[in-house]
Regions:
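Conserved ATP-dependent adenylate/AMP-binding module captured primarily in the ANL superfamily
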Residues: 106, 110-132
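Conserved AMP-binding/adenylate-forming core of the ANL superfamily
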Residues: 18, 35-96, 113-118, 122
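Anion (oxyanion) recognition and catalysis
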Residues: 99
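Flexible, non-catalytic linker and terminal segments flanking ANL/adenylate-forming cores
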Residues: 1-23, 42
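Structured binding elements
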Residues: 102
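Active-site phosphate/pyrophosphate- and oxyanion-stabilizing loops and adjacent acidic/basic residues
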Residues: 27-28, 118
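Short, flexible loop segments at the rims of nucleotide/cofactor-binding pockets, characterized by
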Residues: 14-18, 58, 106-108
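Flexible acidic/glycine-rich loop/turn elements at helix↔coil and beta-strand↔loop transitions
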Residues: 28-35
Length: 132
């Protein structure tokens, strides 16, 4: 089954929550609770100590930076971005940034067998990859 994600933009959903992305939800909470802690990473779930605990404002800023960088690279709405990363705070924020940019995240576990990784990359057809 093919799904044209570009045609979903501006499409009206029946319920208000169906029209929101994760990025939209984080922005809304950021407006009302900017300094509340949003994300806490367990030891080993973040590469940079500054990512250990983030407020909604900080998480939204990082996700926006990712979104702007991806769009500045020439990607367009609906393009696939491969995430070849371990589970981490940074990878989670990258997924949110990808969604905010109107792109499609294709997460791929780096612990998978190389032949399966190659097959999944071929299937996803990413325009760009984020690798940790």
């Amino acid at each position: 089954m093919d799904l044209d994600v570009t045609s979903l933009h501006h499409r009206r959903a029946v319920h208000r929550w169906e029209r929101m992305s994760v990025g939209d939800l984080i922005e809304r909470v950021t407006w009302s609770r900017p300094d509340k802690v949003a994300i806490v990473g367990r030891p080993g779930a973040y590469a940079d100590e500054q990512m250990r605990a983030l407020t909604y404002r900080q998480a939204d800023q990082v996700a926006n930076q990712v979104a702007h960088a991806l769009l500045a690279s020439g990607l367009e709405r609906g393009d696939v971005v491969l995430l070849f990363c371990e589970n981490s705070v940074e990878a989670y924020l990258a997924k949110i940034g990808i969604a905010k940019a109107g792109l499609v995240a294709a997460p791929l576990n780096p612990m998978m067998a190389p032949d399966l990784v190659a097959a999944m990359i071929d299937l996803a057809g990413p325009k760009l990859a984020i690798v940790d």
